């Protein structure tokens, strides 16, 4: 019921163009102020007829009787003419004050038609009565005392009527003004009650609804929607502002929750990939350890080849010296040639072993290159995932770039080692061919030992050629030994870089784990908000 009446009043006020609460309350205040002013004016007008006016009219009755008494006393010779004259003058002044009003005596003029007619009637009677007073006051004059008494009685009666009319008029005016003031005060009370019941009460209900909504917001509940009755008043604008704030914050929290869920998913994927990268780096580190061990063995083998090459060089020089001694030492030369053939065979076997080890190293380097490429791809994927994660993945992106850089350097070093191994294989192939040629010559020397004297010149030339070849073999072996040492150092460096990559991967795993814990805390905090 109250809501219906409140809506009716609201429609009426809005129909008058008073759409805002400020304008509506201003109208009610203006009405109450106008009614209060009207009540004040009515109360003032109720006091406009002074009681002194009624007193003056009543005093005229006593003055009329006093004048009659004083006139009769003068007629009997006992009165004072001055006293009668003073009484007459006082009566006439009172009559003039009643006719025109006298502010000094606080006498107001009552201009009601019936009162004016009664004053006119009293004035006519007073005119006749005044003439008879003068006659009665003279002892020697002939006066109709009965007529004088009748005029005195008539004047007194009309004065009584005048006083009654004036009193009734004063009471009527006073009652009318009092009723007007009472009506204004009653209207003010009605406005206050209506404003409280149908203005303030709906306003307070809306404010209480807003208070409940804001309390829900304070409790992290953004699902409580508000609907404004009118969007063009103060409460409507406040509710509209609250709704915009609620929807914006609710949308923001929903986006944050969605972003947190996606970030948590990305972090989980990055953590899984980092675990896989860590396993790859660990396997790469193991493979590099195996390569380093193989390179150490190859270095030892190359050193052995160098020693054999030097020994072969010494042998050929000895053979050349013995060849110059002559035929007498042919048999000894034959035995030396057999020994030389055996050494050459061993050298060929050693070079074959070197060639095989070089091939093994090439295979290991191929594995290293493949691992480096996989590491590079994993680092690139990690960098892409970190870029997707935004600010939360920046640290992981830095680590991923470092891992990718290490993988690139490992791949470059592996390619360089591969080139050196290929050179080593080419040199080993040449050496094997040379050794096989030398072995063939040695076998020929053994077969042709009987013709050593005739072929002594050719033997000397052959031995000199063997000496040159052995010098080349020794030089190549020394170079291969140096290359093997360089490869060993590079492999050691690669192993160190792999260790750093392994540590970096562990750091990335730790960072991802911390990010995952932070995201879990963020989910707990966001879970408090209902959107």
Curated annotation (Swiss-Prot):
Location of the protein in the cell: Cell inner membrane
Assigned keywords, A-Z: Cell inner membrane, Cell membrane, Chemotaxis, Membrane, Methylation, Transducer, Transmembrane, Transmembrane helix
Top-rank taxon: Bacteria
Ranges spanned by the short sequence motif N-box, renumbered to the chain: 54-65
Pfam families: MCPsignal (PF00015), PilJ (PF13675)
Chain positions covered by the region annotation PilJ-type: 52-140
Binding sites annotated in the UniProt record for nitrate: 61
Domain Methyl-accepting transducer: 259-495
Domain HAMP: 201-254
Residues in the Cytoplasmic compartment per record: 1-24, 196-531
Gene Ontology CC annotations of this record: plasma membrane
Subunit structure: Ligand free ligand-binding domain (LBD) is present in a monomer-dimer equilibrium. Nitrate binding to the periplasmic LBD stabilizes the homodimer.
Protein name, UniProt field: Methyl-accepting chemotaxis protein McpN
Source species: Pseudomonas aeruginosa (strain ATCC 15692 / DSM 22644 / CIP 104116 / JCM 14847 / LMG 12228 / 1C / PRS 101 / PAO1)
Gene that encodes it: mcpN
